[in-house]
Amino acid sequence: MAEANAPNVALDLLRIHSIITRGLNEATSKSQQFAQEGFPHGSTREGFVCYARSFVSVLHAHHLTENELAFPYLREKLPDAPYDLLIAQHQELVHILDQIRVRVEEVAAGPQVAASLSKLNVVLKSIGEIWHPHIGIEQDYFAPEKVGPLLPPKEHSRLSGLFMEHSRKNSGPDYLVVPFLLYNLPPEERVFFARKMPLIVTRLLVPVIWKKQWAPMRPFLLS
């Protein structure tokens, strides 16, 4: 995924899709692995639960931002996109996310961890059945080369900031969600994503002040 010379809000869409896709894949594979083998350490269980909670929070906030801000704006610019279908798919995902929340809390607190992980794995796989076709539609209709020419650079930048702030307000806690966002991207993409955050977040809060709180998630994140 290359960064264009000019701002392009569609590139933000691709990056958040990459973050969520990796989060889904990691949570799915690890839930199956730990259901079979158990958690090697208590800290691994804590980290997995934090990672799964962050995944749910980020996906929920992303779809709220699309429903409430992005799609109403883009309907005027790209009227042929299947917005009603995409919103209906979001609603399907909301119901599954509710199930994932329940299963994650069972993993966090319940004594039957293997059974809870197996149930979580089933629900995560059902997310994947909707998620992958869903983002395929979005990325076809809202490709950077289509969205880029529709808006001046300042408007791309304004929307990028608006969408990011809306997602931030609807997700959390920040000390888990921000590292989840940054470190589910490879380093070359992380650089571009981090530029949209305040320096105090990327240079002080994440690496220093929040470090102990998100450290248990480290095994599930990219270096």
Question: Locations of the language-model features?
Answer:
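Small-residue-biased structural context
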Residues: 1-223
